[in-house]
Amino acid sequence: GMWYGKGPGVDRCGDVFRHANAAGTSKFGGVLAVAGDDHAARSSTVAHQTEHLFKAVMMPVLAPSGVQDYLDLGMHGWAMSRYSGCWVAFKAVADTIESSASVYIDPHRVNITQPDYALPPGGLNIRWPDDRLVQEERLLHHKLYAALAYARANRLNQLVIDSPNPRLGIITCGKSYLDVRQAFDDLGIDDKLAAEIGIRLYKVGMVWPLESEGVRHFAEG
């Protein structure tokens, strides 16, 4: 399934998200909640940002950087939702929604890797009957960690530029990743030069919960 709403819609649906995420998703289903974030309120009643609202209801949050990412991370979002039992949030900003690009549309180009996470007895998907406190325990102790395992196994967060002698590390996500790449181009810094002068660039696809192993590896050096 796919839910879509702008910032005010996310505000109004917080109760829905909390209950649905606690209940879970089907192992043959999955839900992607697409939030149309209009930071400058160009076509909205208020300026808004939604990541903190999804975090409050404990939904993993994906932040695609461009049109190609919308397709690729979208496929991963549904797969992660099926695997972890979580509803998965997907941040869609106005600047990207109103743009165009040439993209690869073959859905089979996205290879899904099953994590090695040890699932609890009964799995993580929706079931009935299901006590509300058991739902909360499953979400806090298993479902979010399963989402982290999925992100790690499928490299949703990537070290895009590495350097043998790193001096400066830049962590970025969403559209700001492309802004950083544009700034590099404006400065005449390609990937080879960035590595030579000691720059590391890390692109975060899942901004919450943040997968710590990849960040720790990035920060070493």
Language-model segment annotations:
Residues 64-221:
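Flexible, low-complexity linker and terminal segments
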Residues 1-82, 93:
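Thiamine diphosphate
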